[in-house]
């Protein structure tokens, strides 16, 4: 029996709702497979923890997480806590502290979901966005001076290192090489940002020589939004900076139907630390407690987690079950359905129990 230790951090808003659904589906997979076991420990960190203790997680939070095989994360952010506190107090310290430098965000149109793009079928939008997750625009460097005065100044410094850019570029090329189309698009803004972004372009060209079977091109980030919208079929694997990929992946989720179906994995490819898996969507306080949060993104990111742990059959079984449920029209309101979170979760669990695909 293969056993894994998972740290669950539901955190804020709909996070507890979708993580509970995700754990229910993982339990169904355990029962269906019969050859692996997941042991989960839940941590109450997040905005409510901050209101009680003045911090989003305890000082020894990373030490507590080190012993786990993976981290299953919900969502962070609350209306009554500044966003920079919630982000820099919980999610980013985990990503950066565990050197989860590869943020991997697959996007495709699931069966039964109608995308907003006219004449865009399931095969026309099937991407993976690779986001540099350790430096760049989210390095945390900068400051404020002369606060409250007319001369007040704020600086936000983006830091790009040769080591950081090279390793994410190599990761993206390897991923593109493993996909059927062997196609990679490198996104920058090197016409206007003439230092770090030009270095990105140069390093991309250097790394490309290691992967002669991968066809690659480069795009400016503003032009990329147009290409994603008008010519989605021309794209496959995409790599971009921390900020650019953050924005583009939200657009990708919307183009596929909803952020409610968009997953992400924060990966330490060297496996020195646990990697973290989370849905892209935010805490969504406007629907918190209504029972209508879309759990599909959480199920998909659970599949990413299983694949990372080496449970590829279980990951495939989960995604097969998800696609059968969406194709049957059992959908939450954000993708045009009438089902609630529990109904979608139950349907996926039933599909797993009856699955004979593997």
Curated annotation (Swiss-Prot):
Locations listed in the record: Cytoplasm
Cofactor(s) needed by this chain: Mg(2+); Mn(2+); K(+)
Keywords from the UniProt entry: Cytoplasm, Lyase, Manganese, Metal-binding, NAD, Oxidoreductase, Plasmid
GO MF: D-malate dehydrogenase (decarboxylating) (NAD+) activity; magnesium ion binding; NAD binding; tartrate decarboxylase activity; tartrate dehydrogenase activity
Gene Ontology CC annotations of this record: cytoplasm
Pathway field: Carbohydrate acid metabolism; tartrate degradation; 2-hydroxy-3-oxosuccinate from L-tartrate: step 1/1; Carbohydrate acid metabolism; tartrate degradation; 2-hydroxy-3-oxosuccinate from meso-tartrate: step 1/1; Carbohydrate acid metabolism; tartrate degradation; D-glycerate from L-tartrate: step 1/1
Cofactor note (record): Binds 1 Mg(2+) or Mn(2+) ion per subunit.
Pfam families documented for this protein: Iso_dh
Superkingdom in the source lineage: Bacteria
Induction: By tartrate.
Reactions listed under catalytic activity: tartrate + NAD(+) = 2-hydroxy-3-oxosuccinate + NADH + H(+); (2R,3S)-tartrate + NAD(+) = 2-hydroxy-3-oxosuccinate + NADH + H(+); (2R,3R)-tartrate + NAD(+) = 2-hydroxy-3-oxosuccinate + NADH + H(+); (2R,3R)-tartrate + H(+) = (R)-glycerate + CO2
Main location: cytoplasm
TM region positions: none
Residues annotated to bind Mn(2+): 222, 246, 250
EC identifiers of the protein: 1.1.1.93, 4.1.1.73, 1.1.1.83
InterPro entries, per database record: ICDH/IPMDH, IsoCit/isopropylmalate_DH_CS, IsoPropMal-DH-like_dom, TTC_DH
SMART domains: Iso_dh (SM01329)
PANTHER family: D-MALATE DEHYDROGENASE [DECARBOXYLATING]
Family, as annotated: Belongs to the isocitrate and isopropylmalate dehydrogenases family.
Protein's job: Has multiple catalytic activities. Apart from catalyzing the oxidation of (+)-tartrate to oxaloglycolate, also converts meso-tartrate to D-glycerate and catalyzes the oxidative decarboxylation of D-malate to pyruvate.
The protein's name in its UniProt record: Probable tartrate dehydrogenase/decarboxylase TtuC'
Gene: ttuC'
């Amino acid at each position: 029996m293969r056993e894994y230790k998972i740290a669950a951090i539901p955190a804020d808003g709909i996070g507890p709702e979708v993580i509970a659904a995700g754990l229910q589906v993982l339990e169904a997979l355990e029962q269906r497979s019969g050859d692996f076991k997941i042991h989960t420990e839940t941590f109450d960190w997040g905005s409510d923890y901050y209101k009680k203790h003045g911090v989003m997680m305890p000082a020894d939070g990373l030490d507590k997480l080190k012993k786990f095989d993976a981290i299953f994360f919900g969502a962070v952010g609350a209306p009554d806590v500044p966003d920079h506190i919630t982000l820099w107090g919980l999610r980013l310290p985990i990503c950066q502290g565990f050197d989860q430098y590869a943020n991997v965000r697959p996007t495709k149109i699931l069966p039964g979901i109608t995308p907003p793009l006219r004449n865009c079928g399931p095969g026309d939008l099937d991407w993976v966005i690779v986001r540099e997750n350790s430096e760049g625009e989210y390095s945390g460097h900068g400051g404020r001076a002369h606060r409250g005065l007319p001369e007040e100044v704020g600086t936000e410094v983006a830091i790009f290192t040769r080591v950081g850019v090279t390793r994410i570029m190599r990761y993206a090329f390897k991923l593109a090489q493993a996909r059927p189309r062997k196609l990679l698009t490198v996104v920058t803004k090197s016409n206007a940002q003439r230092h770090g972004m030009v270095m990105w372009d140069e390093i991309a060209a250097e790394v490309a020589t290691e992967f002669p079977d991968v066809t690659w091109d480069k795009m400016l980030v503003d032009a990329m939004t147009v290409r994603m919208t008008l010519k989605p079929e021309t794209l496959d694997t995409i790599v971009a900076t921390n900020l650019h990929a953050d924005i583009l992946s939200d657009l990708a989720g919307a183009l596929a139907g909803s952020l409610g179906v968009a997953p992400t994995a924060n990966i330490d490819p060297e496996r020195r630390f646990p990697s973290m898996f989370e849905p892209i969507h935010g805490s969504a306080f406007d629907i918190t407690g209504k029972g209508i949060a879309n759990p599909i993104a959480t199920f998909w990111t659970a599949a990413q987690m299983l694949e990372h742990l080496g449970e590829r059959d279980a990951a495939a079984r989960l995604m097969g079950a998800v696609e059968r449920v969406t194709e049957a029209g059992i959908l939450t309101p954000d993708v045009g359905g009438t089902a609630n979170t529990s109904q979608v979760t139950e349907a996926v669990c039933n599909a797993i129990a009856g699955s004979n695909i593997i």
